[in-house]
Amino acid sequence: PIKSSAASDVYKRQQWVLDSGAHSISCVGSTGDNISMSMEEQKMIMKSIIDFVDHRVPVYPGTGRYSTAQTIELSKYAQECGAEGVLVIMPYYLQPHKRAVVNHFRKLREAIDIDIILYNNPRFCGYEMTPLEIKAMVDEGLINGIKAAHGDANRIHELKYYCGDKLTVLYGHDYAPMEGFLAGADGWLSGMPAIFPKFARTLFD
């Protein structure tokens, strides 16, 4: 269980990340250990961080679950707390049909008004959405951004080619971020920037 006494450490860390030049904050994602949290623990942490940051930069909590209903519940709570958007990993483990994945995001889009960043992680999900499939989701208005965790800068180039400025593309791997930026990535969202935020900001600039 997460102790309430840990809140001060969470706040100190978030302030350090902000002071290091972060353009935005993502919390309770993979690096934030959300897979081991209960729904209530996840809600508690996301609310604490959203309240602490207080719109100084956008906050994008990780709200993706295999269950569409749970994903919607967490995402609606993030919106109620004041998050600017949500980071949503695709349904994982059982590798659902692509039509079911799109419908998962369609139901989520119907439930919230804030930005939706799709977390495209082939390693954890066992499948990926292709650039053309992503384009179709963008054209339908289902997503606003993508965390592309392939570790392949060419994928970044393809996404920007097909979607242009309609999609915020975030490089989502710890390795080769410069190649991702050179391919057109709009930002870097991964574990490494959370550990070395000043380095990440310097690389971005």
PLM ranges: what are they?
Residues A6, H104, A176:
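Conserved sugar-transfer catalytic core signal across GT-A, GT-B, and GT-C glycosyltransferases
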Residues P1-A7, Y11:
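Single conserved hydrophobic/aromatic residue that forms the stacking wall/gate
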Residues D9-G126:
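Active-site beta->alpha loop and helix N-cap motifs at the rims of alpha/beta catalytic domains
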Residues F124-D205:
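Catalytic alpha/beta core domains of metabolic enzymes, predominantly
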Residues I2, G29, G62-T63, I89, ...:
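Small/polar loops that bind or transfer phosphate-bearing groups
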Residues P1, W16, Y77-A78, M137, ...:
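A general structural signal for stabilizing positions within well-ordered secondary structure
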Residues S4, D19, E80, E110, ...:
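Alpha-helix termination/capping residues and helix-transition junctions
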